[in-house]
């Protein structure tokens, strides 16, 4: 191609991108909406209640759509105490990651517990959850 022909070429700016915002979907979205309203919502199938809300029953693989509200209390099944949080942690003071089975739920949820000492938490202890303030 000659230099003259190159300068006669039509040019247009082009940017390859795919604009997409994450969607939580109808099940987890409703669970997060419940948290923003200070409610713990689980999904139910028969006698089983899953928290956090599950889209499918992990045993029967059935689609779940029935929601139930649960209390803000549960049993600590296990925990890990973080005495010296690192930069990647969301909290900059000692805290615990605790696996808590909410009263009335079949499954457990991972929750961060603050404003306590390691000696205040025992596995298989009863606790009251403090729900975070969530803005959707």
Regions found by a protein language model. Give the residues of each.
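A broadly conserved sequence feature marking short terminus-proximal activation segments
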Residues: 1-41
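Cys/His-rich short segments
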Residues: 37-71
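Conserved hydrophobic positions within beta-strands
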Residues: 74-76
């Amino acid at each position: 191609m000659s230099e003259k022909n190159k300068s006669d070429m039509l040019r247009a700016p082009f940017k390859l991108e795919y604009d997409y915002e994450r969607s939580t979907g109808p099940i987890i979205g409703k669970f997060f909406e419940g948290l923003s309203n200070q409610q713990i919502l689980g999904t139910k199938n028969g006698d089983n209640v899953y928290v956090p809300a599950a889209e499918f029953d992990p045993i029967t693989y059935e689609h779940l759509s029935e929601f139930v509200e649960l209390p803000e209390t549960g049993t600590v099944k296990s925990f890990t105490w973080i005495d010296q949080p690192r930069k990647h942690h969301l909290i900059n003071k000692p805290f615990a990651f605790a696996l808590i089975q909410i009263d009335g739920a079949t499954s457990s949820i991972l929750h961060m517990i603050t404003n306590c000492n390691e000696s205040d938490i025992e596995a298989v202890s009863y606790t009251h959850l403090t729900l975070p303030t969530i803005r959707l």
